[in-house]
Amino acid sequence: MSDNMQDTNGVLVQGHIKIFDPESQKVYINKRNAIHYENMSIAMAESLANAGEGFIYEMSFGNGGTSVDPTGIITYLTPNSTGTNASLYNQTYTKVVDDRSVNNTDPARNKLETRHVSGTNYTDIVVSCLLDYGEPNGQDA
């Protein structure tokens, strides 16, 4: 084997978020979403080495990342995606999406799926998280 051999394929991670009403199918948001690359690299290494907690367990929600002025203009703050302690601006709610966890109260609708097409060099992870009527409890819609 040659010492000059290099694998240049690399790894590409892209985030995407789609928020929609499951009853009416109305789509509210369908766009690219920020990735925390340092945490993703740690998660991938821990998953492949079967060491630590490099898996998706929960989805967190919050506020403070956007503001709306009196004329309706929406301003988005820069995502907190640097440093291992980076987090949402103001986390207000968390829901378990690991459908193998005993802490998941609705694994049929809050779940993880992998989707792969044979012959391609990518696999999608689809995270489904349903915020039902009255969730989060005590917060206005």
Model-derived regions: residue spans:
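Small cysteine-rich, disulfide-bonded extracellular modules of the LU/uPAR three-finger superfamily
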Residues: 1-141
